[in-house]
């Protein structure tokens, strides 16, 4: 029964079981390491802008850093969902995390050169990967988990995300202010990206949910189409608004 999964003792056992299972653990660590890296770079960039480079436009650049990371979600979420349905989710995840290593290399170059434009480019790249990976990390859970395990699986993925945000904020601030910040941050960003990719390679195949789906070449149009589809179902639309309000 689904209610059994909500029992604290049962949930604790299920958490431990999932964290040792290949059908879940690689996804957990892939999400954690990637989100940690995103927020590490963002907060280190904030420190670089405010305390090392210094600029009268500092506050505006800090706000822009947040927009660079979050902005791609508004445009690419629909495309991410289409890719997750058209292709094997595990294969797409592995490919995205491989590309993320190149983005981490750009971030490392930005830290070594103290180049704000390079770091903004990397941060936007991280946002693109995160937007495309989002539908995969949630869509693959029902494939590999039993319905009784879904509440625990969702809780662990969300917990990984928020723990990564917290740690990324702390470590990014500390590393950004360190005298040897450039070297520390360049090593960290690349190491985290490689570990995230290695985790993604261990995610079991999910199969193709909609192998004949045609990918819309206009990512904004696909996102708007998704919004219209959500609005047509009052229950889904209400759930979407509640979730969006939480993230705001």
PLM regions: where:
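Alpha-helical transmembrane-bundle signature of multi-pass membrane transport and export proteins
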Residues: 2-248
């Amino acid at each position: 029964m689904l209610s059994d999964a909500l029992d604290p003792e049962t949930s604790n056992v299920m958490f431990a079981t999932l964290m040792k299972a290949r059908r879940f653990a690689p996804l957990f660590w892939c999400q954690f390491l990637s989100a940690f890296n995103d927020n590490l770079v963002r907060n280190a960039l904030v420190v670089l802008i405010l305390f090392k480079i210094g600029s009268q436009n500092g506050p505006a650049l800090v706000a822009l850093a947040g927009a660079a990371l979050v902005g791609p979600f508004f445009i690419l979420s629909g495309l991410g969902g289409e890719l997750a349905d058209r292709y094997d989710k595990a294969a797409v995840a592995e490919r995205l995390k491989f590309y993320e290593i190149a983005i981490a290399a750009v971030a490392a170059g930005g830290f070594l050169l103290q180049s704000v434009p390079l770091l903004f480019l990397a941060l936007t790249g991280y946002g693109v990967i995160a937007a495309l990976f989002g539908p995969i990390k949630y869509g693959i859970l029902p494939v590999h988990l039993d319905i009784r395990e879904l509440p625990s699986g969702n809780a662990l993925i969300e917990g990984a995300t928020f723990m990564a945000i917290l740690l990324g904020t702390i470590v990014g601030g500390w590393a950004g202010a360190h005298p040897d910040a450039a070297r520390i941050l360049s090593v960290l960003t690349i190491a985290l990206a490689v570990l995230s990719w290695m985790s993604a390679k261990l995610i079991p195949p999910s199969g193709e949910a909609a192998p004949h789906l045609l990918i819309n070449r206009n990512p904004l149009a696909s996102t708007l189409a998704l919004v219209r589809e959500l609005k047509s179902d009052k229950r889904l639309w209400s759930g979407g608004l509640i979730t969006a309000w939480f993230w705001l």
